[in-house]
């Protein structure tokens, strides 16, 4: 009977199961419950399994331990699934074990269960974690276990059972270490529910509204509000350091980032944004506390003003309209851009902003200016009793250069760029004659203290071919920032009132009615088309010239007390353009015949301009004259052949004063050589009579009609000088600078009553010009 007894069959089945060594997951769970039942009848609980412990592994180990101790009932329960004939007995035995387990404590310790949950969470086995949690019995030991609750919340989120997730998170107060994970579960569950309801992904605003609508429960939140990823404690720490130091060092930033838990970039951006809000209080409401975006202003530029002159903008979007309604004599340079600026009666357009100035300021391409009666602005240079000269070295292209930036597209006169052409008008108070007069100038108070530069050690250059060599008698005054550049150009580009020179502009004859004070200005483009303005009324001593480029340029002839001169320029390469005042004899008529020659370029049509200043008590009439035909002007000039294009524009000047000058600015550059040709007027120019070296007085220029001799300037290459323009041996630089020096020079008696002054030399040889032998003595005319 033993062979047919159920006990023998169970034992044989257990032996077969142990020999095969195969158990399923369900059998493991059954064995787990059997172990729990066996513990109720006195079996010791199994030793804790090593970490991590899987549910099947734990059940298998428990079954083996119980089998070794002789627990035949546990082994029979594991093999009962394979025995069809013992189904009824095994089922009864299973119910008995389950009832025993409900009445007995948990077989595994809470720490063992928490370890298994953490292992499955870290491994990402959420399905196995769900089966393990389902297999755990109801026990008071597991109630309130935070690891178990966190695992249940994670499984509920994974399975999409969000109400159970919310119930778990709101029912238990979790530790702060678990807050970040549980907060993400809370928000992601809310986002997913909203996306399912709306049928579309959520944007940043939608997520923000959901966070406001469903705030975090206090069980997973410390109650400290976070503003733009910055907690209140972090923001307070940043504010405290900001009160002490607005510009913390990198070490302080790193320390603050460590304290607040923020990154170094967040700390730096917070300080930048805070400084920006303090500078612009009106934008505080529109700016975020710290959105991670860098500030628009660089920290290194804080508190430092830009002392360098600003070049003109090359934008051609529009032309600024200027309204001139003053009886003063200011010079306006039109700003290029979209801004519409209207100037008042006595203002200067300074880099696009209106600067109130006193009587008759002159603006010359810079941001430093001089105010005073009949003030002259020479970009930081004080020219009260001095004469400045523009010295640029050769080898310049035909483009206009302003502070090293090409201005071809600004001052170009091609017909395609002509978008709008306007002539500025100004009405005169009364019908008076148009006359011009410089007188003895007034010393102007400069905003920047200037230093006098003495010319020392300059060797004299002998004149060649019977020509005259130009030098100057008065020192140059410069500011403490050194020489400031003024736009200059080679290839016969012209200076108008010491301001901007440009070569492509063509101006047909200008006729002035001496009795009515009207001026008719007509301009022609490079392709022959002509823009003619209506006859306008000008004030006394004012002439307006307008360019054909989209950026109109306004010029005025200086009034009483103003000085025409150009400013020293350095940094360019080897060309020289100068503006010089020529004394005109008393009661002498000067017929200024302008010519331009030796121009090498492609399609450039230079204009040799001449401004003549006479006494205000006399008339200055420009007789109508003719220019070259547009077809002749528009011919392309070959690079290899210099072309002479004389302009038959004559001017008649009647003067009865000793302080009358004719400004000659028609310099032409001989490229490839160090010899600069300055063609004088072809008729009625005064011949300079040389005088003794130590003689000081007024020369008497002899006037004859056939004076057509061409004077040449011999250039002396010397070392470029530094900012303070001190002529010592330590101030030499690498680049070369062209200086003017001669044995004979033009008399400059317009600034003061004296005609000549002796220039001292210190017998120092600075440079040599090719094969020309340099002299050491300087003479006066």
Curated annotation (Swiss-Prot):
GO terms for molecular function: DNA-binding transcription activator activity, RNA polymerase II-specific; DNA-binding transcription factor activity, RNA polymerase II-specific; RNA polymerase II cis-regulatory region sequence-specific DNA binding; sequence-specific double-stranded DNA binding. The keyword Transmembrane does not apply. Residues 1-10 have a biased composition (Polar residues). It is found in: Nucleus; Cytoplasm. SUPFAM superfamilies: Homeodomain-like (SSF46689). Residues 278-290, 299-308 have a biased composition (Basic and acidic residues). The modification Phosphoserine is found at residue 640. This is Homeobox protein SIX4. It comes from Homo sapiens (Human).
